[in-house]
Amino acid sequence: MRNLMVLVIGLLGWTLTSAQTANTEKGKITGKLINTEGKAVVAATVTLQNATDSSLVKAVVSNKEGIYELENIAYGNYLLAVSSVGYEKTIKELSLHTGTAAMDFSIAPSSKTLSDVVIKTKKPLIEVKADKTVFNVEGSINAQGSNALELLSKSPGVLVDNNENITVKGKTGTKIYVDGKMMQLDNKDLAAYLKSINSNDIEAIEMISNPSAKYDASGNAGIINIRLKKNKKYGSNGSVNLGLVQGYTPKGNGSVNLNYRDKKINIFSNVGGNLGNYEEHLDLYRIQNDSIFDQKSRNVYKDKSINAKAGADLFLDSKNTIGVMATANFNDNTWGGNSATNIYYQPTGDYVKKLEAFNTIPGSRTNANLNLNYRYADTAGKTINVDADYGLFRGTGRSFQPNNYYAPNGDLLYQLTYRNYTPTDIDIYTIKADVEINKWKGKLGYGAKAAYVRTKNTFDFYNVENGTDVKQLSKSNSFDYKENVNAAYINYNRQLNAKWGLQLGVRAEQTNSEGVLTRADGIHQADDKVTRHYLDLFPSGALTWTVDKKNTLNLTYSRRIDRPTYQDLNPFENKLDELTYQKGNAFLKPQYTDNVELTHTFMGFINTSLSYSYVKDYSTMITDTANKNATFIQQRNLASQQIYGFSIGAPLPIAKWWNGYVNVWGNQQKFKGEFNGEKINRSYNLYGLYMQNTFNISKKKGVNAELSGWYNGKSVWGGTWVVKPMGGFDVGLQKSMFKGKGNLKASVTDVLFSQYWKSKTNFGGVYIDGEGKGESRTFRLNFTYRFGNNNVKAARERKTGLETEAGRIKG
């Protein structure tokens, strides 16, 4: 721990020292750019590089007179390069040893016409912007051959724990979007869906901490948007991708992308799949009442999944476009687990008995969405976007749970066997419209959305007696839930002057819901029907101050909401296994969060932020005693939460062949509340480190390498679980081939096999000490081949209307 803190402090010191060195006020370089006709060259890029290794020092753009200025440059020898579309790139040597050096350029027109030129740009792996951080997956070697869930764990500040809960910089409540559509799935179903998305089909992952009023208000820790690849070329083209993964067992994945585009229509399609087994080992040591349970488990997840997408855009004219898009995910998998639990009498430590339990959960999940879209855009800056969507989720949950109890001498005491049938049907209908116009010297946006959700859940519980399933009416039920959310927003954005920018917005959301529980035994309970109606306002705003050429400050605020998942509202008991029950909470309230963040951007690339969050009616999964020997789990509004945080991130252009990125974050979380008469007043200090390095080994041969790693200090989940520090690093190598059409990537993830979790909780009369390890260390081999027309033409980007309703489904 001490060594890690030294490393973190050293990295921060190095980053700040490097920034100060880059900013040493020594001298100035200025000049004028003209073409062969003597006219000024406007908006040309002027880059200053070290003469020794060609590493970037600074870059500016020429003004309308063709003048450029590079200020605060340390004395030394440099290369000065000028580039502009339609002109030849020009490079000159320059020595700065006095206060000001002048260097004018006369640049010649390019010998190639624009139609002859293929423009290629390479985005940095990590882009840090004032409002979001972008992980450009497409350019990462170590990201290939994995899936969307694994990629999230490799993103700056993101942690995916053993239960596949996603936290960002220690904060829970992040909402996951895919192509602008919120995934309305609970942890289990969301994880299964994300695992089915090949990393090779992902273009980028965007992390937005304080979304504007245009976005749905769900997500107290902001949103993560996974942008899938979309073909951007005229003509017929496509790509094929094949991947192999070797962990405990071999696995495979693949995808095919096809696209046709001309001036009138764009037709696109994609299909991909995953096949393989994933293994996890889990140990739990639990003390409850006067019993000790020492459990060791091995779980295997057998994954067979297919993702498909198809659609078309019809360009009616230069202003009007209509489109249709269908996406589907088919997941046919089996989760199987076996465990051995030694049970002791806690006061004396005497060995009482042993439980050998098995749990087999076969099932299929289907997630499909249909989107109809209309878009209008004119040259005056007016845009209109209308989306109509239908989404469905179908899950055929089943489980088979044999449990055998043995005496200390090994004799069989008794057997208990159960079978569950738990199908889930969810239908989602949404329609939304967004308008943006130039108004009051800025941009005015407004819109509305209506969403209707219907979910049906069945839980049938059976005792298996002499090979026959006997339905237990007192433990079986059905739960129907209906919800309607109507929303409207207005948002205004304006650059007030050269130094100040302003964004203000407010979103109103009206929620109507009804949950009805029907027990199979016909008994009514107090919470078998709960109806709610409430209206909320969610203001947001941002103020940007450009202090000078080197410093910019950005202050943002937003209010957010986290509604309960649909199944968390089902007030019936669900027997997960012999020792664990789960029950919903019909009276579970939404939690509300106020977020404030101040971001300082230095030299255009070093971002430092300070943040504060207050969460009202904080909800978490509580572990309690259902009876003497079983653990009882329920989602409850436990307490209030306060989070004080900081983060610093910067790209590091170390050398011409070596680029890096570092992000360090930390926060303090405070929880206050009461549970069963017990006062809660807890505080935790958390921190994390993320680093990414790319190496251009041979530009001529197209060989690149990547080294990335992360470390999270002690973290907290749900206010009651403390997770011990963990981390890991990956290495990868990439080779371009077949004249740039092919790409071969090889990588090793979690090289030191250090990504295992350990956590403890002592709450509600239950003490649990757990640890687990999955298949984090793997060897991955991935090959991609692109074919067809390679002329660059940007494709239309669009979000669907299912932005919120599709993350709250729980299977």
Task: Describe the role of every protein-language-model region.
Residues 34-39, 45-49, 83-87, 97-141, ...:
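Short, acidic, small-residue-rich periplasmic hinge/interaction motif at the N-terminus
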Residues 51-67:
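Short, acidic Ser/Thr/Gly-rich low-complexity loop/linker segments typical of extracellular
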Residues 307-331, 359-517, 546-551, 604-610, ...:
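Face-selective signature of the C-terminal outer-membrane beta-barrel domain
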